[in-house]
């Protein structure tokens, strides 16, 4: 059976992309077929090229027509460190087939401007005892779509944004491939949610 075609949207280095590339062996129900970035210098594009995956840098990430053209025939869209808001028209084209990974336990520490180090700084400043990672469906707002899966990460005494980020990222690298594989099986059976 043909694997589910996965398009990755990324703005940074692409470590979650690499986790997916490593997890999706030829027997997997999904394959990364393209990587699209809001930044032409994103490390994710280099990772894609090294893996033989099509890599596209958007000229205008807010342009729905450009993004839809770049997504092409994707069956599943995965936001992995993508910091731009996906245009409404694009979200509407992928109902139940567009997901995001976020480095906190949503709904806490999500929304506009809450990405990367800022999330971990906010978690530590709040005194929270636990952080974690969330995979959720994408809707028209940052980090507000229905939650698919979460995995907690305890905050340790003496944690810094960097130490917490490293432990959360390790969890993201396990959680995202697992969810993508589960969704790919569901898509192959005709249901996404």
Language-model features: locations:
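One-carbon transfer enzymes
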Residues: 1-193
């Amino acid at each position: 059976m043909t694997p589910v075609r996965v398009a990755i949207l990324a703005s940074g280095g692409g470590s979650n992309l690499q986790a997916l590339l490593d997890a999706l062996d030829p027997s997997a129900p999904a394959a990364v077929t393209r990587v699209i970035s809001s930044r032409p210098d994103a490390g994710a594009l280099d990772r894609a090229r090294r893996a033989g995956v099509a890599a596209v840098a958007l000229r205008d990430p807010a342009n729905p027509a450009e993004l839809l053209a770049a997504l092409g025939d994707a069956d599943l869209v995965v936001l992995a460190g993508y910091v731009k808001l996906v245009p409404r028209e694009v979200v509407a084209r992928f109902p139940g087939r567009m997901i995001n990974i976020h480095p906190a336990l949503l709904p806490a520490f999500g929304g506009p401007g809450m990405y990367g180090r800022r999330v971990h700084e906010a978690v530590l400043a709040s005194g929270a005892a636990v952080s974690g990672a969330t995979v959720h469906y994408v809707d028209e707002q940052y980090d507000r779509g229905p939650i698919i899966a979460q995995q907690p990460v305890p905050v340790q005494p003496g944690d810094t944004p960097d130490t917490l980020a490293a432990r959360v990222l390790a969890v993201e690298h396990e959680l995202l491939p697992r969810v993508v594989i589960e969704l790919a099986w569901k898509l192959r059976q005709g249901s996404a949610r």
